[in-house]
Every structure is written in structure tokens, then in C-alpha cells.
Amino acid sequence: MSLVYVNIMIAFSVSFLGLLMFRSHLMSSLLCLEGMMLSLFILGTILILNFHFTLASMAPIIMLVFAACEAAVGLSLLVMVSNTYGVDYVQNLNLLQC
């Protein structure tokens, strides 16, 4: 296994651990999700280029489109929660609270 693959997997693991540890703030969760998507994008692109999968060459671009949509929805949710409650806690997203 190449050092590049190890670094990408470590980046994904660190982002995932950050998502598990800092899940109380919405902004931290969004940053960790973006780090996970970036490492998956780079890993997918490198694998497709190394194995010459010409049919799957659009997959990283499609994943980037979904990541951009996820970021837009997450930021709009962050703005809505910040304007409503004044803080970016994830616990404010619970619809069962009065």
C-alpha cells in the first residue's frame, strides 16, 4: 500500500473521529463532513486514474456535486439555526422540543 493511500485513509479517519468528538456544534460537524468528502474524492480519483476505469471517470465529479449540495444545505441550516437561537448547537435542531 502506497504512502499516498495511507495518508488519505488517515485524513478520512481523523475527519471521522472529529465528527464523533465534536458533534455538539454544527459548524464543526460540517467541517468534518467536508474533510471526509474531500478525502473520498481524492481517493476515488487516484484509484480511477491508477486502474484506468474510463467508464467510472465521472464518479468523482458526481460525488463533488453531491458534496457541494450537502455543503449548501448545511450552511443554510447553520444560518437558520444561528439566526433563530443565536448559537450553532446541534441540540437546537431537535423538533420534539417545545
Swiss-Prot record:
Entry's Gene Ontology molecular function annotations: NADH dehydrogenase (ubiquinone) activity
BP-aspect Gene Ontology terms: ATP synthesis coupled electron transport
InterPro entries, A to Z: NADH_UbQ_OxRdtase_chain4L/K, NUOK/Mnh_C1-like
Record keywords, A-Z: Electron transport, Membrane, Mitochondrion, Mitochondrion inner membrane, NAD, Respiratory chain, Translocase, Transmembrane, Transmembrane helix, Transport, Ubiquinone
Domain of life: Eukaryota
One Pfam assignment: Oxidored_q2
Cellular compartments per GO CC: mitochondrial inner membrane; respiratory chain complex I
Reaction(s) the record says it catalyses: a ubiquinone + NADH + 5 H(+)(in) = a ubiquinol + NAD(+) + 4 H(+)(out)
Enzyme class: translocase
Role noted for this protein: Core subunit of the mitochondrial membrane respiratory chain NADH dehydrogenase (Complex I) which catalyzes electron transfer from NADH through the respiratory chain, using ubiquinone as an electron acceptor. Part of the enzyme membrane arm which is embedded in the lipid bilayer and involved in proton translocation.
Quaternary data: Core subunit of respiratory chain NADH dehydrogenase (Complex I) which is composed of 45 different subunits.
Protein name as catalogued: NADH-ubiquinone oxidoreductase chain 4L
Gene: MT-ND4L
